[in-house]
Amino acid sequence: LEALEKINCNVKKEFKSISPKLGTLEEYLLAVFDLFISKGKACKRSGFSLTLLAMETSELSPLIAEKCSDILENWRLLLADGLYDRNLPEDLCNPISEWLFTSIQGAISANRIHKDEAFLYNIKSTIKIISLASPEFLREIFTKGNEEEIVA
């Protein structure tokens, strides 16, 4: 657990350091994505694999799986804060951060399993779509007809 907390502190520090430096939404999202990719390379793996660690340990060590899950949720909340800091409407920050964070985790996991960079390039396309879309279009995608958030 101590090693997980060390990773968490390191990533949170780097996560927060990107926020004030990059102004546009696209630059910010690409920097966040690059942070996860670079952490994977630093761990000598093809992707930052806290998600896979949580999956692999869920039955053997629920405590480790829960810690991984808590760390990932904390990082997702940092992403939501970063979206808000870039003037994304507040009602869109959580659903978009949930969708994007889940997509990033999936792409990194798929890249690691299949050893195929295409999964990582899909995230860059997703970032471009989020960056170029109007708030109205994003609301259409990320909210239900009765204005409730879609749960990712």
Residue ranges and their predicted role:
Residues 62-72, 85-130, 134-146:
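Hydrophobic/aromatic-rich alpha-helical bundle segments in the mid-to-C-terminal region
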Residues 2-6, 15-46, 97-100:
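Hydrophobic alpha-helical connector segments
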Residues 3, 7, 11, 15, ...:
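Hydrophobic recognition helices of helix-based DNA-binding modules
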Residues 18, 36-41, 49-59, 82:
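Helix-loop "lid/cap" segments that line or gate small-molecule binding pockets
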Residues 9-12, 27-31, 42-45, 61-85, ...:
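Amphipathic alpha-helical packing segments from all-alpha helical-bundle domains
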Residues 17-23, 83-92:
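Surface-exposed helix-capping loop/turn segments at secondary-structure junctions
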Residues 2, 31, 35, 52, ...:
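Alpha-helical elements of Rossmann-like donor-binding domains used by nucleotide-donor carbohydrate transfer enzymes
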Residues 11, 46-50, 103:
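N-terminal alpha-helical segment
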